[in-house]
């Protein structure tokens, strides 16, 4: 969602990294995570604290602005802070990775003061909700075997191609690849449809993920706190139904990465209502 950039100011050896926005009276990330001295990005990473203004607060930690951001440890630290807050059942508006401002005063003056009301409204809508993301990957050999069994045209072309020298079978190989790719795309769409049909009723909002070669099926779900166990069980049941063909992975509770921007950028009724 929102991001912040360094202010035009005299360079300093310290700056504020901003993770996201929470209610001003929410527990800090160390309390939410049940661990003292909770840390985020940077080398070494500094403790995360809150900068409050009115009803909202920014989660920040100090960093050295001269050190480039973007290491795997930085990315993990950014998500770890936000997801710990979400797991503690605190509403949070996650910022994109890399939001940096000059100092705590700039956090207030440039971020919280001008946008505080929008942040407060969005946090109210996200209260009691967290994101769960479900990703599915194919068992490639099993799925290809199933395609050959269920598509006689593909099975015939595969047999014809195997019987020809490689140079002579190039057109057939290209056609075979096209047919298999199209069938995989159809199955990915059907899988995503079933995923949303099975799990969507347990969420207040859903976002279908764009399919990719390594993740053909996936979606994110905004789930009420009291339905987390039910959602987890339903995901396990779907995974059991798909066992041997598609491996499901459930991530969550997470900060609402796929939903927060729609609230802040589109004031008014919740986009999913």
What are these regions (language model features)?
Residues 1-273:
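An interfacial alpha-helical scaffold signature
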């Amino acid at each position: 969602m929102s991001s912040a950039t360094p202010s035009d100011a005299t360079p300093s050896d310290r700056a504020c990294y901003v993770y996201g926005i929470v209610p001003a009276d929410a527990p800090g990330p160390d309390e939410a995570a049940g661990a003292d001295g909770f840390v985020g990005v940077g080398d070494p990473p500094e403790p995360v604290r809150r900068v409050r203004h009115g009803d909202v607060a920014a989660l920040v930690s100090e960093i050295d602005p001269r050190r480039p951001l973007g290491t795997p440890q930085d990315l993990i630290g950014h998500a770890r802070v936000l997801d710990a807050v979400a797991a503690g059942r605190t509403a949070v508006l996650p910022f994109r990775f890399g939001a940096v401002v000059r100092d705590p005063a700039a956090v207030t003056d440039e971020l919280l003061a001008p946008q505080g009301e929008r942040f407060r409204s969005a946090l109210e809508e996200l209260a009691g909700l967290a994101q769960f993301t479900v990703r599915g990957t194919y068992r490639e050999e099993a799925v290809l075997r199933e395609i050959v069994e269920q598509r006689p045209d593909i099975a015939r072309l595969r047999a014809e191609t195997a019987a020809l020298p490689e140079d002579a079978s190039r057109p057939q190989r290209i056609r075979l690849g096209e047919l298999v790719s199209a069938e995989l795309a159809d199955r990915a769409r059907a899988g995503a449809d079933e995923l949303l049909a099975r799990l969507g009723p347990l969420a207040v909002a859903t976002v279908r993920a764009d399919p990719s070669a390594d993740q053909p099926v996936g979606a994110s779900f905004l789930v009420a706190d009291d339905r987390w166990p039910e959602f987890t069980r339903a995901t396990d049941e779907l995974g059991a139904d798909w066992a041997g063909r598609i491996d499901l992975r459930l991530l969550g509770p997470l900060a609402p990465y796929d939903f927060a921007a729609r609230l802040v950028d589109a004031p008014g009724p919740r986009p999913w209502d």
